[in-house]
Regions:
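N-terminal DNA-binding recognition helix of tyrosine site-specific recombinases/integrases
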Residues: 1-24
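Short, basic (Lys/Arg/His-rich) helix/loop patches that form interaction surfaces
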Residues: 161-201, 205
Length: 207
């Protein structure tokens, strides 16, 4: 709920309804606590353990691979991942616009993620036939209502999180979620000394 309030306050600040001095969020002011498993990104060693992990259960391997795809595809949001089509692949790159920003022309930014060998392996193993009109992953059909699409996404995220929680416990890493993949992508780049503005751009954050 606090995140929704912050969004409204941001809008009010932008519209000039409230002054900067009246804005309640930020360092030294009110800070929104993050949930367990969201506090920090994984280390390279932990990521390697996840990448190397093999389960005897095919379902676990499938959702682990989708988690890896999220991480490698610039920490893509699951909503955007499930909407990717083969036509979004151009010259070895996946090009997409974050659903969060696609309605606002001002903030509309195309994200490009180079398809690595591991990403291609995930697509080859769990994806649809590589035809331009096909979704890369077999969850959306294309005729879903917005509510149905949201329900499908929520279900896939739930399945990924369930399997990753088990893997995290087995590897002694703790709770791992789709959010962890996105956060870890940014953290690894940051620790490697990559420019913050580049990280924001590759995640599709708006200014």
């Amino acid at each position: 709920h606090m995140r929704n309030i912050r969004t409204l306050m941001n809008e009010a600040k932008r519209a000039g309804v409230i002054k900067e001095s009246q804005y309640p969020f930020g360092k030294g002011l009110f800070e929104i606590k993050t949930g367990i498993g969201r506090k920090k990104g994984l280390t390279k060693k932990q990521l390697k353990a996840i990448f190397d992990y093999k389960s005897g259960n095919e379902t676990t391997n499938r959702y682990k691979d989708l988690w890896i795809f999220i991480y490698l595809c610039n920490g893509i949001n699951p909503t955007d991942m499930l909407k990717l089509k083969f036509s979004d692949i151009v010259d070895g790159e996946i090009c997409f616009v974050r659903q969060k920003t696609e309605r606002t022309t001002k903030n509309r930014k195309e994200i490009r993620a180079t398809i690595s060998v591991q990403m291609q392996a995930v697509i080859d193993k769990w994806g649809n036939k590589p035809l331009p009109d096909n979704y890369i992953f077999p969850y959306m059909k294309g005729n879903e209502t917005a509510i149905e699409a949201k329900a499908i996404t929520r279900d896939v995220v739930k399945r990924i999180n369930k399997r990753m929680k088990l893997i995290g416990e087995e590897l002694g890493i703790g709770n791992i979620t789709t959010y962890t993949a996105r956060h870890s992508y940014a953290t690894v780049l940051k620790r490697s000394g990559v420019n913050i503005s580049y990280i924001s751009e590759s995640l599709g954050h708006t200014d």
